[in-house]
């Protein structure tokens, strides 16, 4: 596993990696080049979209899970898609969180189709003038 982080925090995570038996290679965004992600099974971005905007073109060379949902799509997601890679975007993560929360709060199955349709409508219309 390679972790590309905004700052070098390897010392913080070394004990956990050892405990889990995971070998982690570390890099910062400044070190990251396309060679780091080419051939990766998946690239996961868990930071605000603005944190990777400067590096989106270099990093958008692998299948992507990007949990950011504002802006939609992120520059990283647009770069990955433009390079022909599948993307799973933050609104999908948001929807699944909402399904789970609905079920936990109400004790009833979430109306997933209706919730998904409402989310898609909101995403499609959010940047249009009212």
Question: Could you tell me what each predicted segment is?
Answer:
Residues 20-88:
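Rossmann-like adenosine-cofactor binding region
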Residues 11-18, 57, 81-82, 117, ...:
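Polar/charged alpha-helical tracts
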């Amino acid at each position: 596993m390679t972790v590309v982080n905004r700052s070098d925090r390897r010392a913080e995570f070394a004990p956990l990696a050892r405990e889990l038996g995971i070998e982690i290679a570390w890099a910062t965004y400044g070190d990251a080049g396309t060679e780091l992600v080419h051939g990766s099974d998946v690239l996961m971005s868990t930071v605000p979209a603005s944190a990777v905007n400067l590096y989106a073109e270099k990093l958008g060379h692998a299948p992507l899970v990007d949990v950011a949902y504002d802006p939609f799509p992120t520059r990283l997601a647009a770069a990955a898609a433009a390079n022909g890679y599948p993307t799973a975007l933050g609104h999908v993560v948001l929807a699944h969180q909402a399904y789970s929360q609905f079920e936990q709060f109400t004790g009833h199955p979430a109306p997933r189709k209706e919730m998904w349709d409402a989310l898609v409508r909101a995403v499609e219309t959010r940047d249009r003038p009212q």
